[in-house]
Amino acid sequence: MAKKSLILLYGGRSAEREVSVLSAESVMRAINYDLFSVKTYFITKEGDFIKTQEFSSKPAEDVRLMTNDTVDMSRKIKPSDIYEEGAVVFPVLHGPMGEDGSIQGFLEVLKMPYVGCNILSSSLAMDKITTKRVLESAGIAQVPYVALVDGEDLEQKIQEIEEKLSYPVFTKPSNMGSSVGISKSDNQEELRASLDLAFKYDSRVLVEQGVTAREIEVGLLGNADVKSSLPGEVVKDVAFYDYQAKYIDNKITMAIPAQLPEGVVNTMRQNAEIAFRAIGGLGLSRCDFFYTEDGQVFLNELNTMPGFTQWSMYPLLWENMGLAYPDLIEKLVALAEEAFAKREAHLL
């Protein structure tokens, strides 16, 4: 049987491009090369598409993908040159211009099947404020928050924050991920600094009530028939799970499955599936929850292209469910082809 061609897109223009490289290298090593041949394309921080390595067998451990530090601009191509009939694209891209609907729209114009959520669900879930409003309408509990838009009366919004919330609070760019631009504030002075930081990344900012809680994550896999994994827990060695701790220092460990009451597990899995359907999710997502000391469950966020690094929660959650990393990739490709066939049929 002829191998299927799988195209990995990685890098990208967002602040999370380094995470994308780590994820792509992990996927590259986990692929079943009896079933797939692999082509990789690097998107630079300027948005150029670079044709990089091809693999017909598992690469050696010392093989590294091209990055912004090693980029060879002589291999630059037109973005549309990635098109290959019958190939499936795995956009291992995180953050804006990656999992926000941009690349998904590009791939739909090219008429190529791709792994993961479509334009609408990707763009919706990428924006924290919009996601919160959609999940509110679905009846899912979330922590109290205040939304800010650049240009609004800052003093009035700070007054609203201090009336509705209590310190500590967390300030987040609405349209970022991987803890980029997120900071904790224990007083108004720190809040002002946090708002300045968040507005550097986005024109819309979310301020959330800080809660003392365990951080629990649930994997989602499927299209209309989405299934959820047993939860896993992020166990931190630092007070705040920021970008530095999450990806660079690796100061976290994970408990899979998380030790939780059965009723809490069921609530989280049910809410994760409801949330996935509420945004119109396809393929995969990771749903993150807070579980407080007094037993409350709050949905924190949906991540439509979770990390795929060797220490990322999402593939480990499915491994715990009996689905090995190579089989997970095979399943995601099959789901991509299923979604593509339905999308094309609706357009005919």
UniProtKB/Swiss-Prot annotation:
Binding-site list for Mg(2+) 1: D288, E301
Function (record text): Cell wall formation.
Pfam families tied to this protein: Dala_Dala_lig_C, Dala_Dala_lig_N
Family stated for the protein in its record: Belongs to the D-alanine--D-alanine ligase family.
Protein name: D-alanine--D-alanine ligase
Tree of life domain: Bacteria
Bilayer-crossing regions: none
Family matches, as SUPFAM superfamilies: Glutathione synthetase ATP-binding domain-like, PreATP-grasp domain
Location of this chain's protein in the cell: Cytoplasm
Cofactor: Mg(2+); Mn(2+)
Binding residue positions for Mg(2+) 2: E301, N303
Cofactor, free-text remark: Binds 2 magnesium or manganese ions per subunit.
Catalytic activity: 2 D-alanine + ATP = D-alanyl-D-alanine + ADP + phosphate + H(+)
UniProt pathway annotation: Cell wall biogenesis; peptidoglycan biosynthesis
Enzyme Commission number(s): 6.3.2.4
Designated gene of the protein: ddl
Biological-process GO terms, alphabetical: cell wall organization; peptidoglycan biosynthetic process; regulation of cell shape
Organism in which the protein naturally occurs: Streptococcus gordonii (strain Challis / ATCC 35105 / BCRC 15272 / CH1 / DL1 / V288)
Molecular function as annotated in GO: ATP binding; D-alanine-D-alanine ligase activity; metal ion binding
EC top class, as a word: ligase
Domain ATP-grasp: 132-334
GO CC field: cytosol
PROSITE patterns named among the record's database cross-references: ATP_GRASP, DALA_DALA_LIGASE_1, DALA_DALA_LIGASE_2
Keywords: ATP-binding, Cell shape, Cell wall biogenesis/degradation, Cytoplasm, Ligase, Magnesium, Manganese, Metal-binding, Nucleotide-binding, Peptidoglycan synthesis
Sequence positions that bind ATP: 162-217
